[in-house]
């Protein structure tokens, strides 16, 4: 089955790119945002400081437009269409003994609605005047959270199922938008996070400061958390943990690792495993050079908001060189914006997958303290790796072959 899927993908490469209809490109800025870039071909990491037409990004206002372009092509090639807020969004809230339940109803019409409920665990004590900061954890909380921050465990599988390829089109999102919606499971999860924030903004009883929301998750849920931070601008802090292929690694770099003899997950395999990407991505996994973006630009979409990624070199499958190289490339955007300490990356080994060793607490708590708890005197200058890349050589000047501008 996997071989036939790859053969079909090779045939489909001869077809024109499957662009989203103009009405289905999310409008995010007053600039051209095509969902495909015909004729693009680049074996190295694409320059994030070039617009689709090849002109240079020279200001922070330009970056806003460039971010919108990246959002459009990520949807067009791999993620599928992310719908905007539907016309119906409402919420109810109940609480008891330090916990609460937020029930969100979203719909396209009065006879086409869905509802889902998410639990919130609150800190002890008196809430700040603006409400509690909140961490939204995909599926399960796998990192420590300091005192003074509420936690919601997001049941993202209810929104879009992800058991295997048979999960395509299964979940509440598809009950609303149809089983033929192009959105991948991860895109549907982003939509769910956005509806949760919509609901919290109009539910004062929940007592959440919606300007101080973080998202996190590990492994497949780390991929989802990065997507949420990239596409939902109301997320104040994004913390993907060991997201590996399809997360904070780059497709081109993971292929380079595989070609170097490393046993890593890369694009041709991941599309046969689950429904994290749209079916359209199958058309490109054997010809990655035609992608006018890579995941350094997905991560850079979070900018200028803070991003903290954790990776684990204990697991070759997670593409350790790809993660470091990809986030190094994303880091150039934060440098260009004059906020390099808004982007953290910590890569260590010697621990189990999704286990969070206490040696990482300092970096994590620094980002929480500074960006959710408003402690201004905290340093968030963390960008480190142990360079355990299984003997594969990282050549920064080859892969990151652009000059980082200063964006005023």
UniProtKB/Swiss-Prot annotation:
User: EC top class, in one word?
Assistant: hydrolase
Query: What domain of life does the native source organism fall in?
Result: Eukaryota
Q: What Gene Ontology molecular-function terms does this entry list?
A: carboxylic ester hydrolase activity
Name listed for the protein in its UniProt record: 4-O-methyl-glucuronoyl methylesterase 1
Annotated EC:
3.1.1.117
Q: What is the species of this protein? A: Wolfiporia cocos (strain MD-104) (Brown rot fungus)
Role of this protein: Glucuronoyl esterase which may play a significant role in biomass degradation, as it is considered to disconnect hemicellulose from lignin through the hydrolysis of the ester bond between 4-O-methyl-D-glucuronic acid residues of glucuronoxylans and aromatic alcohols of lignin. Can hydrolyze benzyl glucuronic acid (BnGlcA), allyl glucuronic acid (allylGlcA) and to a lower degree methyl glucuronic acid (MeGlcA) in vitro.
- InterPro entries, alphabetically? AB_hydrolase_fold (IPR029058), GCE-like_dom (IPR054579)
Catalytically driven reaction(s): a 4-O-methyl-alpha-D-glucuronosyl ester derivative + H2O = 4-O-methyl-alpha-D-glucuronate derivative + an alcohol + H(+)
Q: What family does the Swiss-Prot or TrEMBL record give for this protein? A: Belongs to the carbohydrate esterase 15 (CE15) family.
Annotated substrate binding lies at: 223, 265, 273, 317
> Where is it chiefly localized?
secreted
Question: Could you tell me which cysteines form disulfide bridges?
Answer: 31-65, 218-354, 250-326
Name a single GO cellular component. extracellular region
């Amino acid at each position: 089955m996997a071989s036939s899927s790859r053969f079909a993908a090779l045939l489909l490469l001869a077809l024109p790119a499957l662009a989203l209809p103009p009405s289905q490109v999310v409008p995010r800025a007053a600039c051209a945002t095509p969902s495909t870039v015909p004729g693009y071909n680049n074996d190295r990491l694409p320059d994030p400081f070039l617009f689709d037409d090849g002109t240079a990004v020279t200001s922070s206002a330009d970056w806003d437009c460039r971010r919108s372009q990246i959002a459009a092509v990520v949807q067009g090639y791999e993620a599928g269409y992310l719908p905007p807020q539907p016309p119906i969004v409402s919420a109810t809230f109940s609480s008891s003994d330090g916990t609460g339940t937020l029930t969100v109803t979203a719909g396209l019409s009065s006879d086409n609605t869905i509802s889902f409920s998410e639990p919130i665990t609150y800190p002890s004590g008196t809430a700040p005047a603006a409400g509690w900061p909140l961490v939204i954890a995909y599926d399960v909380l796998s990192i420590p959270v300091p005192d003074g921050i509420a936690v919601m465990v997001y049941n993202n599988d209810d929104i879009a199922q992800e058991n295997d390829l048979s999960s395509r089109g299964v979940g509440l999102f598809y009950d609303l938008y149809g089983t033929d919606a192009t959105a991948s499971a991860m895109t549907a999860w982003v939509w769910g996070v956005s509806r949760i924030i919509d609901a919290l903004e109009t539910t004062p009883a929940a007592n959440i400061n919606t300007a101080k929301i973080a998202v996190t998750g590990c492994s497949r849920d780390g991929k989802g958390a990065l997507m949420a931070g990239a596409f939902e601008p109301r997320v104040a802090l994004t913390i993907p943990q060991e997201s590996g292929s399809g997360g904070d690694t780059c497709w081109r770099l993971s292929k380079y690792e595989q070609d170097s003899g490393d046993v890593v997950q890369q694009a041709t395999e991941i599309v046969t495993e689950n429904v994290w990407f749209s079916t359209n991505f199958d058309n490109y996994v054997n010809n990655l050079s035609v992608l006018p973006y890579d995941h350094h630009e997905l991560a850079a979409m979070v900018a200028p908001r803070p991003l903290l990624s954790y990776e684990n070199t204990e697991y070759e499958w997670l593409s350790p060189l790809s993660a470091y190289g990809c986030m190094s490339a994303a880091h150039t955007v934060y440098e260009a914006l004059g906020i390099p300490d808004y982007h953290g990356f910590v890569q260590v080994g010697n621990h189990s997958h999704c286990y969070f060793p206490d040696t990482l607490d300092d970096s994590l708590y620094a980002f929480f303290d500074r960006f959710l708890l408003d402690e201004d005197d905290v340093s968030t200058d963390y960008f480190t790796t142990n360079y355990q890349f299984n003997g594969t050589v990282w050549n920064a000047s080859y892969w990151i072959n652009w000059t980082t501008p200063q964006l005023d």
